[in-house]
Amino acid sequence: MVTSQQSTAAAGSVPLELPYYGAPIGVAVKRFFTKYATFTGRASRSEYWWWALVNYAVLLVLGILALVAGGTPQVSVDGTVAPPAGGAIVVVLIITVYSLATIIPGLALTARRLHDGNFSAWFILIALIPGIGGLILFILTLLPSKPEGARFDQGSPQYS
């Protein structure tokens, strides 16, 4: 079933207020930063999962750089641990800045993804349940879009 919004996506750009179903990777990343702290509205699965892939790839590369730069602790024979090399400290600082810069938009994107499945953004807090919370949130973000999720859009009566 093709919705009017999906046919709009084929013809041109999708308004930021609407989810972009079938978003390409570049558009998904651009929308992630454009909607930096927007917790209202919805995000399609492609918007969410393309960003997740890019985010994990960036963190993987930075983590490898930290290890290559001397981030593994070196234990000597007498049991003392040498401090990490200066390069590793720089990379860890970059990882910290990157993580701080993407935590708010990451939470906003997750909230919008939950909205698209017709769940409240408060379901993000389920990730705080030890052990199973993260898995439950992961499954919720995998679920397909529901038309009822439109109630979270900015023009809906809930936000009027």
Each predicted region: which residue ranges?
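Membrane-helix interface segments in multi-pass membrane proteins
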Residues: 4, 59-103, 127
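Amphipathic alpha-helical interface surfaces
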Residues: 93-96, 100-113, 121, 134
